[in-house]
Amino acid sequence: MVAVATSFAFSVSAQDSEVETQTIGVVIDAHALVDVVADEIVFDFSADDPVEAGSPLVLGANKNQTTHLNYSLMLSNGGLADGTISVRITDMNEGMHLTLLADGKYAASLDRDKYGLLGTVASNFDATQGANPVILTATDQILIENIGSSYTGNGSGNGYLLQYTAHINDYSKLDADNGAQDMGTITYTIAE
């Protein structure tokens, strides 16, 4: 019995040396979060009513609205910068359409080591490149592309500036809302 105990004591001390290694594990969950800072944008044209018979409703300054798009993305695909944010609209008022441009200057100025690989505005939406405003439809359109693991910061002034403009495209389909508002939905989807 004594011999067994002595042998065990020597085998335990034989595992130690002047260099020791330890295995560690790191677990990070993949995540994809997108947020538009203003949850609701209202295009109020009640002050744009014509004052002279025979004059049309002409959309005034309220036809232009802005907000910011923020996101956080942790890729699950080995670091390929293939994340995207797409945009679509449903239930837009008949007789109208909405256009969108995006400005990514602020996001492009962020430190890559701190914020990660932020995406670029797709060229057809890029306000900084002189793009024409894109008409939003019910079909997803890529707005931000080449997103790596990154985050934009949270709130107004962070991320990407979104610039909406409302347009009349068929006057015959317009109708008065009598104080209520027609509701449409703009959907942003982040994916990799």
Report each predicted region and the residues it spans.
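N-terminal small/polar-rich segments of proteins
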Residues: 14-133, 140-192
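Bacterial N-terminal signal peptides
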Residues: 1-7
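Sec/Tat signal peptide C-region and signal peptidase I cleavage site
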Residues: 8-14
